[in-house]
């Protein structure tokens, strides 16, 4: 972006204003790809930047969502379910039921508590649906589960 474009944005939207140069985001992803080993997968965390999905979806291997709302945005953007990692602590039976009815079990699901494990196991068994899961092990903080819970 040039100075004149930035002035126009400031005059139109006020300051402070947060601006993404989509071409720069795409260039950074390509740069990461060039610097990392060929078999390295890249995952874009949707979080507060769901508007970047149309620009990054084809450049990364996966998109990580942490809420049912973020998953819904991926559905609207027609992201293939197998490309989505469902992460975060906001997993309820109903939200996972909705997600799994759409994904048919495709994608990756993180387990961040015993409750998440129970929800995913119940829904997988009920629907005879194998799931790919990652267990988020705690390093002694409030996030994840301790290794003794599952191993």
Spans of features found by a protein language model:
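A charged N-terminal "starter" segment
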Residues: 1-132
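Active-site loop/helix belt of alpha/beta enzymes
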Residues: 122-126, 139-151
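ATP-grasp fold ATP-binding core
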Residues: 132-138
